[in-house]
From Swiss-Prot:
Phosphorylated. Phosphorylation is enhanced upon serum stimulation. The gene is Eif3j1. Residues 4-72 are annotated as: Sufficient for interaction with EIF3B. Component of the eukaryotic translation initiation factor 3 (eIF-3) complex, which is composed of 13 subunits: EIF3A, EIF3B, EIF3C, EIF3D, EIF3E, EIF3F, EIF3G, EIF3H, EIF3I, EIF3J, EIF3K, EIF3L and EIF3M. The eIF-3 complex appears to include 3 stable modules: module A is composed of EIF3A, EIF3B, EIF3G and EIF3I; module B is composed of EIF3F, EIF3H, and EIF3M; and module C is composed of EIF3C, EIF3D, EIF3E, EIF3K and EIF3L. EIF3C of module C binds EIF3B of module A and EIF3H of module B, thereby linking the three modules. EIF3J is a labile subunit that binds to the eIF-3 complex via EIF3B. There is a cross-link at residue 109 (Glycyl lysine isopeptide (Lys-Gly) (interchain with G-Cter in SUMO2)). It comes from Mus musculus. InterPro entries: eIF3-like_dom_sf, eIF3j. Belongs to the eIF-3 subunit J family. Its main location: cytoplasm. HAMAP family: eIF3j. This is Eukaryotic translation initiation factor 3 subunit J-A. Residues 73-138 form a coiled coil.
């Protein structure tokens, strides 16, 4: 009986030991369940990463991104080229309109020969300016200007200053043989677009200037005549008379003067 009791006690201890052993919580399960304070630190550690089948895939993606950027630049260049073409098209259309106006006769309004010439010159000037602007845009000419060309007068004072600069620029060539003809052509060309009343004002101003110059020229000629020598020995006779008044006779100083002469 005593032996059976001892065996039963030993079996009981073994069962309790097994129970204690298998009742322990699985550390892995406890960590996964968030039972411990430091469980979050290892969270996701065992998750499978998105591992690429081929290590060259990263390089291929980088190459694709690099190839996309030049496409953007090319599209920008295309936009610029399209803008340039549009400008050229508008410029060409404008030139064709000007050329058409130059060639077709004026039917709606009867113009005098002078007015027709003025209109043609004006249109020709517009066409030349249009051609010059197109050439600048085509060849990328820098439009940075200085001095007179940089001025853009709008007020009376601005035009006064602009006129002074133009005068200083032009009058430095007044000694040239072609200066007068140059001014004649210049005044005619710059006055083409003016109204009749404005032309009359300019004409009157030039007429007054011409009258003043004529008066000055006459006065200058009169002064030269007074200072001139009288022909036929008049100056010698006058000096002789003056000496005779001092001497009172034909000898003396007069005779000495004649001997000296």
């Amino acid at each position: 009986m005593a032996a059976a009791a001892a065996a039963a006690a030993a079996a009981g201890d073994s069962d309790s030991w097994d129970a204690d052993t298998f009742s322990m919580e699985d550390p892995v399960r406890k960590v996964a369940g968030g039972g411990t304070a430091g469980g979050d630190r290892w969270e996701g550690e065992d998750e499978d990463e998105d591992v690429k089948d081929n290590w060259d895939d990263d390089d291929d993606e980088n190459k694709e991104e690099a190839e996309v950027k030049p496409e953007v630049k090319i599209s920008e260049k295309k936009k610029i080229a399209e803008k340039i073409k549009e400008k050229e098209r508008q410029q060409k259309k404008r030139q064709e309109e000007i050329k058409k106006r130059l060639e077709e006769p004026e039917e709606s309004k009867v113009l005098t020969p002078e007015e027709q010439l003025a209109d043609k010159l004006r249109l020709k000037k517009l066409q030349e300016e249009s051609d010059l602007e197109l050439a600048k845009e085509t060849f990328g000419v820098n439009n940075t200007v200085y001095g007179i060309d940089a001025m853009n007068p709008s007020s009376r004072d601005d035009f006064t200053e602009f006129g002074k600069l133009l005068k200083d620029k032009i009058t430095q060539y007044e000694k040239s043989l072609y200066y007068a003809s140059f001014l004649e052509a210049l005044v005619r060309d710059v006055c083409i677009s003016l109204e009749i009343d404005d032309l009359k004002k300019i004409t009157n101003s030039l007429t007054v200037l011409c009258s003043e110059k004529q008066k000055q020229e006459k006065q200058s000629k009169a002064k030269k005549k007074k200072k001139g020598v009288v022909p036929g020995g008049g100056l010698k006779a006058t000096m002789k008379d003056d000496l005779a008044d001092y001497g009172g006779y034909e000898g003396g100083y007069v005779q000495d003067y004649e001997d000296f002469m």
